[in-house]
């Protein structure tokens, strides 16, 4: 076990004010992420095949892939706050353009652009959170960050399902408006970070550090497997639910269940998981993530699908806050944005290949897809459990200079 930590409420009260502002902006943005979870359903209703809809999600992932590298670089050079604001404004504009797509080429191009423009804020927000919070508080801070993220995720898809029942156009408009609100929050309330070293302007140092960081490699490899599973939630899960005869609103409710569980239970669960070695906690969580979606192979009722989502969510709540804090502890402050960007690349790979391969596999055999997800969860657990040890406080845990 790791050393004793302060009580949860004391840890939350100790978080600086800008952290709470970042949480609020994250909630706004995620609440309004209406379009992507419903894009496959929207496109199939327009007459596109599931495989074509999967390509659009893959194109979004390709844009997300580029966004991780661009966002990581901008976070370390332009600054965290400006990067967040620029991403939100450009993301809002591309969502409005995506609403006008009617051809496959249009969906592919604009989905890729939306993935780039609307997602390059992520390395900046993760880096800013790590900048503002000392190492001993990072598990709680990242858990609270995810609570804000998932509070939006809990209410957003349910709201989107209601809006979609009236008009899918409102999904695009609402997505754009909430992005603009986050941009305003970033401009007026978030601090400006200044990189501590001039060498932060060059990718060479970051790539050299990453190339020799074996612990980082293990995290990345495990994340690749887990990302494939996670992104079935916004690609094949909706089709699986509707193929069983249930409505898009049912899919929205199942997605919201995931968010509600995280909002109410992840922080209390963190008070337990932060006491144990990080890699061991991550391995248990990853295995449960695989078991949850693996169970979908045998789930045919709403209750069974909800049960599968509950197991998946338990694994998510156990693993992800600890893995986020573990990653933050690995990163040198002046390279933090690019470390976070490279980490994000693995999730983009999962989005690209997870959605495309997942859609293809789903078209041939839904059971094979979900059983593959189960196997990948155990693969990720095996990778991350090697060299089990607690997260240590290293010389990488200094802060960046902050100015307003």
Predicted regions and their residues:
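Residue-level signature of mid-helix packing/kink "hotspots" within the transmembrane helices
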Residues: 34, 61-69, 153-154, 259-267, ...
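Helix-to-loop junctions at the C-terminal end of transmembrane segments
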Residues: 67-79, 265-277
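Cytoplasmic helix-loop-helix junction between adjacent transmembrane helices
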Residues: 112-149
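Helix-loop boundary and gating motifs at the non-cytosolic
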Residues: 12-61, 215-222, 227-254
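Helix-loop junctions on the cytosolic side of multi-pass membrane transporters
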Residues: 131, 175, 186-200, 386-396
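Juxtamembrane intracellular "pre-TM" segments in multi-pass secondary transporters
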Residues: 2-16, 191-221, 404
């Amino acid at each position: 076990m790791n050393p004793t930590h302060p009580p949860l409420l004391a840890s939350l009260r100790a978080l600086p004010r800008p952290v709470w502002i970042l949480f609020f902006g994250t909630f706004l943005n995620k609440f309004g992420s209406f379009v992507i979870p419903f894009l496959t359903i929207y496109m199939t209703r327009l007459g596109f095949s599931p495989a074509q809809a999967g390509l659009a999600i893959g194109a979004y992932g390709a844009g997300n892939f580029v966004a991780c590298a661009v966002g990581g670089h901008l976070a370390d050079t332009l600054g965290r706050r400006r990067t967040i604001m620029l991403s939100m404004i450009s993301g809002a504009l591309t969502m409005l353009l995506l609403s006008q797509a009617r051809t496959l080429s249009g969906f592919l191009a604009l989905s890729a652009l939306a993935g780039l423009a609307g997602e390059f804020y992520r390395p900046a927000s993760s880096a800013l959170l790590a900048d503002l919070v000392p190492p001993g508080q990072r598990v709680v801070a990242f858990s609270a960050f995810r609570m804000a993220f998932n509070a939006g995720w809990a209410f957003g898809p349910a709201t989107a399902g209601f809006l979609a029942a009236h008009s899918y156009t409102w999904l695009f408009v609402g997505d754009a408006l909430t992005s603009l609100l986050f941009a305003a929050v970033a401009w007026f309330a978030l601090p400006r970070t200044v990189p501590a070293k001039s060498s932060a302007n060059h990718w060479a140092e970051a790539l050299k550090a990453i190339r020799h960081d074996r612990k980082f490699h293990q995290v990345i490899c495990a994340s690749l497997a887990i990302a494939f599973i996670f992104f079935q939630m916004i690609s094949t899960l909706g089709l699986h639910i509707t193929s069983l005869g249930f409505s898009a609103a049912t899919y929205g409710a199942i997605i919201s269940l995931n968010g509600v569980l995280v909002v109410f239970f992840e922080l209390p669960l963190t008070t337990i998981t932060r006491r144990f070695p990080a890699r061991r906690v991550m391995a248990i969580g990853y295995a449960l993530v695989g078991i949850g979606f693996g169970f979908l192979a045998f789930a045919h009722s709403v209750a069974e699908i909800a049960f599968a989502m509950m197991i998946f969510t338990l694994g998510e709540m156990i693993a992800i806050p600890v893995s986020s804090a573990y990653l933050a502890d690995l990163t040198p402050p002046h390279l933090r944005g690019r470390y976070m960007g490279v980490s994000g690349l693995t999730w983009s790979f999962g989005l690209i290949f997870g959605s495309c391969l997942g859609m293809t596999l789903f078209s041939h055999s839904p059971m094979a897809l979900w059983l593959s997800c189960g196997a990948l969860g155990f693969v990720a657990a095996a990778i991350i459990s090697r060299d089990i040890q607690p997260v240590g406080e290293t010389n990488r845990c200094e802060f960046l200079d902050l100015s307003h």
